[in-house]
Amino acid sequence: IKNFKNYFKTSEAKWITYLSATSVYGDHNGQWVDENSETKPTSLNGVERLKIEKDWMTLSNKFNLPFQIFRLSGIYSNQYNILTRLKSGKAQIINKKNHFFSRIHVEDIANILSNSCNHFKKNEVYNISDDKPASSEEVALYGVKLLGINKPKTVEVNKIESEMLKNFYKDSKRVDNKKMKKFFNYNLKYPTYVEGLDYIFNNII
């Protein structure tokens, strides 16, 4: 952000959009969160994201630029998704009861960003997420069904070795996206992981 302090003195920028993450909400025990929910990040990534949101807000106010925050849920794409991980043999199922996680396909992110170029309000926050929060196990099992393969091994959450995965499974929440859909008048191309994985399976894999 320091690199932009001088840039905005002479630039013709009309607004600032920061792509943040729903990790800023932290753990809400599987409950729904919206843009007014408490931010209480548990991971280093979430803490840093929240700080950067505030830094960008300060900078945008200094130059009187409209500012919007897009809090992205877990991103997947036609190239990076549970189907490719299952096919590679690298996927595993983590056993943790009542762990909910929201997702968003990268195409929907791009479409919403494009819409926002001509349709934005000053100092707003939007959750960018699909309609169906689900456990990682639920999504993986749907992928197994599509591919017609055996279920990968199950690992208990307290046996996870990866620090990144440990941080991921600290948080459980369902991300509400009604504000995003209403303001941008946007119908998701992939409203749930089902449509997203079906498309990838039928057209990419």
Q: Model regions: which residues?
A:
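Mid/C-terminal beta-alpha module of Rossmann-like enzyme folds, strongest
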Residues: S116-L165
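Conserved C-terminal active-site "lid" loop/helix of NAD(P)H-dependent oxidoreductases
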Residues: L141, I160-N187
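Amphipathic terminal alpha-helices
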Residues: P191-I205
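NAD(P)-dependent short-chain dehydrogenase/reductase
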Residues: M57-F101
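Alpha-helical substrate-binding/gating segment
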Residues: T84-Q92, N98-Y126, D130-P133
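Conserved Rossmann-fold NAD(P)-dependent oxidoreductase catalytic core, especially the SDR/UDP-sugar
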Residues: N3-L44
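Catalytic helix-loop patch of NAD(P)-dependent Rossmann-fold dehydrogenases
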Residues: N29-I69
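Non-catalytic, hydrophobic alpha-helical segments
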Residues: I109, L113, I128, V139, ...
